[in-house]
């Protein structure tokens, strides 16, 4: 009688993960696009800028969407020299000042109210540019959006939703017009 020997050399390994959850993260980003036209209609400068969304702006977004709260009117303004910070509020932004009213350069009228198109592909954009008609000479360093506050320049009411800085400060003179669009995107 013969004996067959069997030697097992194959190995099997398996790993099982339990309690795994899909990751679903969301971030909000925005872009301003500012174009300065001379009194003759020529482009003096053209700058797209990434903005930051402030902490109070993110909180307002959550409260509005999930808390059944009304956001309020949206207005846009211009900022002077100094960097925006996520901790900035409309009442307290120590790194910069709003321009247009007390701080030069001045522009005519109140803070303009942008119109927005319907959201699509996780983005919401202005349907047309808002215009700032400059009435004096000075330096502009960026843009901001206020929600639920006053359209009056230098008002500290409402929520500072976002602010963005140009790559460098921009000079303007009386007769210049700054046209600004904005797009917010959720990723």
Question: Model-flagged regions — what are they?
Answer:
Residues 1-142, 147-187:
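Small cysteine-rich, disulfide-bonded extracellular modules of the LU/uPAR three-finger superfamily
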């Amino acid at each position: 009688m013969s004996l067959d020997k069997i030697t097992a050399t194959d190995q099997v390994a398996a790993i099982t993960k339990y309690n795994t959850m899909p990751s679903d993260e969301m971030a909000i980003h925005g872009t301003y696009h500012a174009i300065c036209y001379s009194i003759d209609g020529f482009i003096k400068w053209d700058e797209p800028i990434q903005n930051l969304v402030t902490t109070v702006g993110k909180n307002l977004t959550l409260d509005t969407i999930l808390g059944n709260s009304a956001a309020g009117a949206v207005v846009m303004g211009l900022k002077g020299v100094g960097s925006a910070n996520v901790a900035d509020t409309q009442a307290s932004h120590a790194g910069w000042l709003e321009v247009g009213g007390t701080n030069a350069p001045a522009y005519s009228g109140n803070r303009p109210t942008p119109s927005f198109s319907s959201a699509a592909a996780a983005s919401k954009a202005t349907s047309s540019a808002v215009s700032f008609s400059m009435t004096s000479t000075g330096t502009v360093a960026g843009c901001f959006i206020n929600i639920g506050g006053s359209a009056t320049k230098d008002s500290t009411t409402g929520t500072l939703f976002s602010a963005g800085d140009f790559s460098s400060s921009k000079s303007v003179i009386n007769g210049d017009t700054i046209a600004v669009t904005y797009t917010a995107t959720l990723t």
